[in-house]
Amino acid sequence: MKTLLLTLVVVTIVCLDLGYTMTCYNQQSSQAKTTTTCSGGVSSCYRKTWSDIRGTIIERGCGCPSVKKGIERICCGTDKCNN
């Protein structure tokens, strides 16, 4: 009986942990705030900032992409942390 109970507890913990999905902001520059649920396995959000002839551009989303020189990138690991 104790073995069965322990097995059920372990299975529950594993299933709850695997079911977590990250939520990140995904609006661009000065648009209204919107969020997206990241695909499975993605555990970070990013915000990229750069300037061009239009002014300061901000891009947000899921993951932590590589960037070119001159682009500031911030990656973080909690829900909606990329505001």
UniProtKB/Swiss-Prot annotation:
The keyword Hydrolase does not apply. GO terms for molecular function: acetylcholine receptor inhibitor activity; ion channel regulator activity; toxin activity. Disulfide bonds join C24-C45, C38-C62, C64-C75, C76-C81. Residues 1-21 form the signal peptide. It is found in: Secreted. Pfam families: Toxin_cobra-type. Keywords: Acetylcholine receptor inhibiting toxin, Disulfide bond, Ion channel impairing toxin, Neurotoxin, Postsynaptic neurotoxin, Secreted, Signal, Toxin. One of its GO terms (cellular component) is extracellular region. Transmembrane segments: none annotated. InterPro entries: Snake_3FTx (IPR003571), Snake_toxin-like_sf (IPR045860), Snake_toxin_con_site (IPR018354), Toxin_cobra-type (IPR054131). Expressed by the venom gland. Belongs to the three-finger toxin family. Short-chain subfamily. Type I alpha-neurotoxin sub-subfamily. Binds to muscle nicotinic acetylcholine receptor (nAChR) and inhibit acetylcholine from binding to the receptor, thereby impairing neuromuscular transmission. This is Short neurotoxin 3FTx-Oxy3.
